[in-house]
Design a protein with these regions (language model features):
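A generic structural signal for short, non-catalytic loop/turn and secondary-structure boundary residues
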Residues: 1-3, 34, 53-54, 82-84, ...
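Aromatic- and Lys/Arg-enriched surface recognition patch
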Residues: 71-118
């Protein structure tokens, strides 16, 4: 069973905006002739890397909800120009919307088990919820209607 990470998407207002950020980074990489992979740099290197690489994803918390995920394809520890240890979380450049679930803010990243992870939004009734404008979806959820 794969292990996942969960992290706040700081400064991101919606899944659509996150997808836009990833698309911009991929366009820049394409222009520079670099590999098409989405990289997020973090200060701490996950110790359970083999479990994460066995099908794990990085789940993104956007505006207080677990809202999307990206599949982790590599974990690359490195030292920055000041000699400080960092880590590149390399992900497939495909943002997958998940069934929204409330999540309080926290710092850094955390491990996230498979049984705690929300399901992907598929081609079902949940997909119509994903198609709603996010403010409407949040309001309906706050009212207990979703």
């Amino acid at each position: 069973m794969p292990l996942h990470l969960i992290k706040l998407a700081v400064g991101c207002e919606s899944v659509r905006e996150l997808k836009g950020w990833v698309a911009e980074r991929m366009a820049t990489a394409r222009k520079k002739g670099l590999p098409l992979r989405h990289i997020h740099i973090t200060r701490m290197t996950p110790k359970r890397d083999q479990e994460l690489l066995a099908g794990g994803s990085l789940y993104w918390v956007i505006r207080g909800e677990i809202a999307a995920r990206e599949k982790i394809i590599a974990i690359e520890p490195f030292r920055d120009k000041d000699g400080i240890g960092r880590c590149r979380l390399v992900m497939q450049p495909k943002v997958i919307a998940v069934s929204p679930r409330p999540m309080r803010a926290f710092q850094g990243w955390r491990y996230f088990t498979e049984d705690a992870a929300p399901p992907d939004l598929g081609k079902s009734a949940a997909a119509s919820v994903a198609a709603m404008p996010e403010p409407m979806r949040r309001e309906l959820r706050d009212l207990g209607l979703l």
